[in-house]
């Protein structure tokens, strides 16, 4: 019996900023109590390496399971932890505070690798107006 593996990856898509996002431009997420938040980790990983990582790479690396491994983890150990992590469905980048709170849209290229763009940037507007790119909204912070 083969284990089901879930994915958060999407190709050629834009996660648009949530309708109730308070930011009118891209804001850099800040640490909380001197410690990085998931949003600060996601921001640094994607902003510093645009189109290098997939959504799955970012979601796993910034999860508690991914952070617990550390850099010294063997590739086989990392792969096993990743398979276990994705054996259940995981929240995709639509649920990230980047698009819900901080004003960043997430674009994925045809290979599913991601980059972020400020909501007020020309690149974001270009992607948002492109009918060839699948458009999805970041999840709202509040119901209703």
Protein language model features and the residues they cover:
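Long, contiguous N-terminal structural blocks used for assembly/anchoring
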Residues: 1-58
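Acidic-enriched, low-complexity/disordered segments with a strong bias for Aspartate over Glutamate
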Residues: 19-20, 56-57, 109, 120, ...
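Amphipathic protein-protein interaction modules
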Residues: 59-124
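A recognition module on extended beta-rich or small alphabeta surfaces enriched in W/G with H and D/E
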Residues: 129-144
């Amino acid at each position: 019996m083969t284990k089901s593996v879930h994915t958060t990856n999407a190709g050629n898509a834009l996660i648009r900023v949530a309708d109730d996002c308070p930011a009118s431009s891209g804001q850099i997420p800040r640490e909380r109590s001197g410690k990085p938040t998931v949003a600060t980790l996601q921001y640094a990983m994607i902003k510093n390496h645009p189109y290098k990582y997939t959504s799955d790479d970012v979601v796993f690396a910034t999860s508690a399971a991914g952070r617990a491994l550390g850099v010294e983890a063997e590739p086989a150990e990392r792969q096993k932890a990743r398979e276990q992590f994705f054996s259940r469905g995981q929240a995709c980048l639509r649920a990230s505070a980047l698009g819900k709170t901080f004003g960043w849209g997430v674009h994925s290229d045809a290979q599913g690798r991601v980059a972020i763009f400020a909501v007020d940037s020309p690149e974001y507007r270009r992607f948002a107006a492109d009918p060839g790119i699948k458009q999805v909204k970041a999840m709202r912070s509040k119901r209703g």
